[in-house]
Amino acid sequence: MRAVIVAVGVAFLVSLFCTPIAIRVFTRLKAGQPIRAEGPVMHQGKKGTPTMGGVVFILATVIAYVAGHLALTTLPDAQIAQVEPTITALVLLGLMVFSGAVGFIDDFLKVRKRHSGGLNKRGKLLGQILVGAVFGVIALYFPSTMTDAQGTLTNTETVGSTTLSFIRDIPALELTKVGAVVLFIFVVMAATNGVNLTDGLDGLATGASVMVLAAYALIAFWQYRHWCADPNYTQDYCYSVRDPLEIALIAGAAAGACVGFLWWNTSPARIFMGDTGALGLGGLIAGMAMSTRTILLLPIIGGLFVIITMSVVIQIISFRTTGKRVFRMSPLQHHFELAGWSEVNIVVRFWIIAGIGVAIALGLFYSEFLASVG
């Protein structure tokens, strides 16, 4: 727990104090956000606001992980507190960094062209598929080599699983490794695009991501306290995951980094996360779902992202089939803007929806544990 607290604190402070530096640097470089002409009229006043702020909280998360991981060396149980970084950490941070890199290319092209059209859809899609495939393979083909004091292998879990999972793996829904990689690519694409579509109002995606990441920190830490690699727990209700403390540490670090960034990103935003931040957060959240064996729980934890994504899907299907639009504008937050809601009201109310999804998911997670124990 100390390591997680260290990671959260370091991430928050790095993000809080480095974001103003990023604002000055990006302003000097004229890295301002272009605004779509067809978007809400009230957004034109945001034109030129520094973007690519996701670089800050991605960097803060990595730095905080290093600090938190070093704190693990003070724990008495060297079996769990390995000094070297785990593959789990490399997969999760890799997903965040390289998904963010795809977004950075998109942001860079937007700034360079002075136009809201950056990386084309095919290029962005290819980048997401490549990131998902590479880290999906790593997650599924590299089992743990953790040993106990007698040199006996105690946990042979991979970061990911070939079994579809809700709160735990579901044995009846076993996939091939190729099928599992394809599933993971889909989850990465869904999560990155979900966060990206949500990132349309000041602080909206950042605040929602804080809740989702905090939920995963709690889930992973609970799994660590009831881990199958711990001989004090029986196989009936322990969790078969790999490196849950590392997962909790990274989730907590990312949540803390987002809180620090939110200080500057809340309305009126002085900086935007850009696709750099949105895709980076989406990649990390996808990795959290995979590594904690909660893939089918993700649509509930990230319920706001699902609702906003579905509003876009519904709008497209409706317009193409009937020629009519269901919403004034999609994604959903812009519909309410055009309906006369203030930006702050929309953000706070959508945060409430995000919080409800997180609360339901945590309730289901804990209820399943109680049912297993009972």
From Swiss-Prot:
Belongs to the glycosyltransferase 4 family. MraY subfamily. One of its GO terms (biological process) is cell division. It is an enzyme of class 2 (transferase). It comes from the Bacteria. Its main location: membrane. Its cofactor is Mg(2+). It catalyses: UDP-N-acetyl-alpha-D-muramoyl-L-alanyl-gamma-D-glutamyl-meso-2,6-diaminopimeloyl-D-alanyl-D-alanine + di-trans,octa-cis-undecaprenyl phosphate = di-trans,octa-cis-undecaprenyl diphospho-N-acetyl-alpha-D-muramoyl-L-alanyl-D-glutamyl-meso-2,6-diaminopimeloyl-D-alanyl-D-alanine + UMP. Pathway: Cell wall biogenesis; peptidoglycan biosynthesis. This is Phospho-N-acetylmuramoyl-pentapeptide-transferase. Coiled coil: none annotated. PANTHER family: PHOSPHO-N-ACETYLMURAMOYL-PENTAPEPTIDE-TRANSFERASE, PHOSPHO-N-ACETYLMURAMOYL-PENTAPEPTIDE-TRANSFERASE HOMOLOG. It is a multi-pass membrane protein. Its EC number is 2.7.8.13. It is found in: Cell membrane. Catalyzes the initial step of the lipid cycle reactions in the biosynthesis of the cell wall peptidoglycan: transfers peptidoglycan precursor phospho-MurNAc-pentapeptide from UDP-MurNAc-pentapeptide onto the lipid carrier undecaprenyl phosphate, yielding undecaprenyl-pyrophosphoryl-MurNAc-pentapeptide, known as lipid I. One of its GO terms (cellular component) is plasma membrane. GO terms for molecular function: metal ion binding; phospho-N-acetylmuramoyl-pentapeptide-transferase activity; UDP-N-acetylmuramoyl-L-alanyl-D-glutamyl-meso-2,6-diaminopimelyl-D-alanyl-D-alanine:undecaprenyl-phosphate transferase activity. Keywords: Cell cycle, Cell division, Cell membrane, Cell shape, Cell wall biogenesis/degradation, Magnesium, Membrane, Metal-binding, Peptidoglycan synthesis, Transferase, Transmembrane, Transmembrane helix. The chain crosses the membrane at residues 3-23, 52-72, 85-105, 125-145, 170-190, 201-221, 244-264, 271-291, 294-314, 350-370.
